[in-house]
């Protein structure tokens, strides 16, 4: 099932298919790409004119009806008033009307129900005393269409706090919060705490701020000194994490493999190697992530099958790698693979449990095991570098623990029950890999988080690589 839409409908779909298995006895694949509480952080070093242009495109293009659209503009206190004054002026120059005309900037929302929901939200904010600004360029031709169409004027709502916005408003409504420079880490934590992680923008000329935001934000697509919409296939692979989507990213190397029931284990590695021949891969982080796997490989000296699996998974693992993607001059696009935080591993056989452990350690994730005799005994026997990556939890309520991926070995009835229990959870959709006892073809790419970063290098003075062209 491939789905684009709301988080609520994606959750219903997952619960609907959780009780079904395919012809091979595996869970039905679900790729869900949902919405987000997308923010843009603007500090005092940003160029205001460029910020306004990018905010208009990100918040109001397609009448704000893009899943990637900007929903919350976060302005540093020192430049908030000046930026808002210029933004209000720009909004007042926008023409709203028939999108078939080239002179139109903002078209209608999709239907009358959407219009009513958006207007209800705006009225709720007004009743709470929040400043609301609406403006559009007056034109008699457009005005006639407003009466018969489902139009909502571009709207600016000032909030006291990011947490005031509890859900995505899918339309031409931009919320604004102000922040103190010293409170930037807390602001990023608030954005992460929303649970959504689709797009995030940052406008700044300070490299340290770029590194701080991109290094700590839990979002699938990050944009620096540019707008946040219009991702291009193969240039900015698109898709979120958490409540914003299951992965893999559309337009990225992992997507088509998610649709295959069977494929060679090395297929993804071959695909990436072909790409790496043209653009070198940065794998500095991978070495640090795989240290526990190396410890498990040494411990398995008398277990040749497990040792061979450790070697195989270690060679196939791609977590901790960053790749430069093709793109226009003046823009730098990278695609990074990171490990999921914690993987629930369920098995009733020691060899299967160790197979799961090797796969999870290969990508650098933590392991969640049921607290039973089999797994307690294994934890005691394993080296400390490995056992430190394992958490035990009571088996009867283990699905209530935090985890973002599942690997299961067992029979189909147990697998179906596990899928239903995982689907019944609140929060982000979690995918389950199911295998019969003894299988070792675990798909490591299902344990990755993908991050796309698009940087407007021209905004910081130009593309220095052009100087090397001879």
Predicted regions and their residues:
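ALDH superfamily catalytic-core signature
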Residues: 7-160, 182-185, 224, 252-318, ...
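Short hydrophobic alpha-helical runs that function as membrane-insertion/retention elements
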Residues: 199-203, 222-223, 367-370, 391-393
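Short hydrophobic alpha-helices that are characteristic scaffold elements of the AMP-binding
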Residues: 361-362
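A short, charged/proline- and glycine-enriched loop
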Residues: 336-342
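Conserved phosphate/anionic-ligand binding catalytic regions in large, soluble enzymes, centered on
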Residues: 232-233, 237-254
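Short beta-alpha connecting loops at secondary-structure transitions
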Residues: 37-41, 104-107, 174-176, 239-246
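Conserved glycine-rich beta-strand-loop-beta hairpin in the small C-terminal domain of fold type I
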Residues: 149-153, 167-174, 193-198
């Amino acid at each position: 099932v491939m789905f684009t839409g709301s988080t609520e409908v994606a959750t219903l779909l997952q619960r609907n298919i959780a009780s079904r298995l395919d012809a091979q006895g595996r869970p039905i694949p679900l790729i869900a790409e949902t919405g987000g509480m997308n923010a843009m952080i603007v500090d005092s070093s940003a160029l205001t004119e460029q910020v306004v242009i990018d905010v208009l495109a990100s918040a109001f293009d397609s009448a704000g009806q893009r899943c990637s659209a900007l929903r919350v503009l976060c302005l540093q206190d020192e430049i908030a008033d000046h930026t808002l004054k210029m933004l209000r002026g720009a909004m007042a120059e926008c023409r709203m009307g028939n999108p078939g005309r080239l002179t139109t900037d903002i078209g209608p929302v999709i239907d009358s129900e959407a219009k009513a929901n958006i207007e209800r939200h705006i009225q709720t904010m007004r009743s709470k005393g929040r400043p609301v600004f609406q403006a559009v360029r007056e034109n008699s031709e457009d005005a006639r269409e407003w009466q018969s169409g489902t139009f909502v004027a571009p709207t600016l709502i000032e909030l006291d706090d990011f947490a005031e916005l509890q859900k995505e408003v899918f339309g031409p409504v931009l919320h604004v919060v102000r922040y103190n420079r010293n409170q930037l880490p807390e602001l990023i934590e608030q954005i992460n705490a929303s649970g959504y992680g689709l797009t995030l923008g940052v406008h700044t000329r300070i490299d340290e701020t770029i590194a701080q935001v991109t290094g700590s934000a839990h979002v699938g697509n990050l944009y620096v000194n540019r707008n946040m919409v219009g991702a291009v296939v193969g240039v900015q692979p698109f898709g979120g994490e958490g409540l914003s989507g299951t992965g893999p990213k559309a337009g990225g190397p992992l997507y088509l493999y998610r649709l295959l029931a069977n494929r060679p284990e090395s297929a993804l590695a071959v695909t990436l190697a072909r790409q790496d021949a043209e653009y070198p891969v940065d794998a500095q982080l991978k070495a640090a992530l795989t240290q526990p796997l190396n410890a498990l490989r040494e411990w398995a000296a008398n277990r040749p099958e497990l040792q061979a699996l450790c070697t195989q998974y270690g060679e196939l693992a791609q977590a901790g790698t960053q790749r430069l993607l093709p793109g226009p001059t003046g823009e730098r696009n990278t695609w990074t693979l990171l490990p999921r935080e914690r993987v629930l591993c369920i098995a009733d056989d020691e060899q299967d449990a160790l197979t799961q452990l090797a796969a999870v350690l290969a990508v650098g994730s933590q392991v969640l095991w049921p607290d039973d005799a089999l797994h307690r005994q294994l934890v005691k026997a394993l080296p400390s570098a490995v056992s430190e990556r394992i958490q035990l939890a009571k088996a009867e309520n283990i699905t209530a623990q935090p985890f973002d991926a599942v690997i299961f070995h067992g029979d189909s009835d147990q697998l179906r029950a596990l899928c239903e229990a995982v689907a019944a959870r609140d929060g982000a959709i979690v995918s389950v890999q199911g295998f019969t006892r003894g299988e070792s073809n675990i798909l490591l790419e299902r344990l990755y988080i993908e991050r796309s970063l698009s940087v407007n290098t021209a905004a910081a003075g130009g593309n220095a690589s052009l100087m090397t062209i001879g």
